[in-house]
A protein has these predicted regions:
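Preference for protein termini
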Residues: 1-373
Length: 373
């Protein structure tokens, strides 16, 4: 399987530390009930709650202010929501130990990665293990991500679709895979680095001067509005995926807002803004993370008023405190479940595993199975 991974271009499969990103030395096993009741159903419920949050933000200036959405993004988000712009996908990160309800840690709403691994690699691993007789033929996996993407493309796009990202191997692999699913859906994908997109002042164009009608951009909305193109008139001539309304959800600032909307929800953790004493009492055990950060950067884990883990990074700005939900410990390995939605429907999971409480870019990806003896 590692040879296949290397051929697919996963140069980041082995980091400088020597840690293998794709790790098939172990796998996680779930019962059908655990998947259906504890992961799939809560994921759908949280996804619906997030749509309610967007509706609330569009209607109430105070919610926009609390979330801290940049002013230049607010009108884009409102217009996108009112148009009913379609969404492709997203990933909820959950803490789940098999005994209590899964807890939402955060929502990767705008630019989620580790998609190819979840949709393709672990499914290939499952087929290999069944073929080799290592796993019983009845073994399954919660994974309809690939087929769901193909069907969603048919709903939200037509004709030519451009795919753009930074010149980063992980981002490029994600974009190439999504372009492949779009092609299966009957669309005509065109991929390019995001820095090769041009602007005529009326339309965005690719490096062959073809107009960009629909753009899947693996590039955060808050960066787009800061770039030179953010204020361009061409913004109104292109359909974006993910749509601008997803920017409302692509911040950890939604965590205290969700808790305020649904206090006591079994799949939410109490959360507050770090600078707001009016929030819930977290009892001296919490995780502090910047509202806008990536790959587990600048996170501080506090237990019983003592710092037990910190991560480095360059992210600053407002932060949130979220009640500590210790990740389950399997011989020193701590998994986070990435629960994928396509459209608004739960369709599969991928698991990242590390040694600490914070998932970072060095956390390994492990496959999973569903098996009922």
């Amino acid at each position: 399987m590692k040879k296949i991974i290397a051929q697919a271009g996963f140069a980041f499969a082995e980091e400088e530390s020597g840690i293998h990103y794709w790790d098939e030395s172990a796998y996680y096993s779930f019962t059908p009930e655990e998947i259906e009741d504890d992961i799939e159903a809560p994921t759908n419920e949280i996804a619906a709650l997030c749509l309610e949050l967007v509706e609330k933000a569009i209607a109430e200036e105070a919610v926009f202010a609390a979330i801290g959405l940049p002013l230049e993004l607010q009108d884009l988000a409102r217009d996108s929501w009112k148009r009913g712009d379609g969404t492709l996908y997203g990933r909820f990160d959950l803490s789940y130990d098999g005994h209590g309800p899964a807890k939402l840690l955060e929502y990767n709403a705008d630019t989620p990665t580790s998609l190819f691994e979840a949709a393709v690699f672990q499914w290939g691993w499952l087929e290999d293990k069944i073929s080799a007789g290592v796993l019983p033929k009845a073994t399954d996996q919660f994974n309809s991500i690939h087929d769901s993407l193909v069907e969603q493309w048919k709903r939200i796009a037509r004709g030519h679709v451009h795919f753009a990202s930074l010149r980063d191997i992980e981002d490029e692999v994600t974009v190439q895979y999504l372009a492949h699913t779009a092609q299966i859906a009957g669309l005509k994908p065109i991929t390019l680095p995001i820095d090769e997109i041009g602007d005529t002042g009326v339309r965005f164009v690719d490096n062959a001067m073809h107009p960009i009608d629909t753009l899947f951009k693996l590039y955060p909305w808050e960066w787009i509005v800061q770039d030179e193109f953010g204020g361009s008139r061409s913004m109104t001539s292109t359909k974006f995926l993910e749509p601008a309304w997803k920017a409302v959800l692509s911040t950890k600032a939604i965590l205290p807002v969700l808790w305020e909307m649904e206090p006591g929800h079994p799949n939410l953790l109490p959360a507050r803004f770090s600078d707001d004493a009016r929030g819930p009492d977290l009892g001296g055990s919490f995780v502090r993370k910047p509202c806008r950060s990536r790959e587990g950067a600048n996170v501080t884990v506090v237990e019983n008023c003592k710092i037990i883990e910190t991560t480095a990074g360059t992210y600053q700005g407002r932060s949130v405190d979220q009640a500590l939900a210790r990740l389950p410990d399997f011989q020193g390995n701590r998994p986070v479940i990435g629960s994928w939605i396509v459209g608004q429907k739960s369709c599969g999971i991928g698991i990242r595993e590390g040694r600490g409480e914070v998932t970072t870019n060095l956390s390994r990806f492990l496959p999973h199975i569903i098996y009922e003896a």
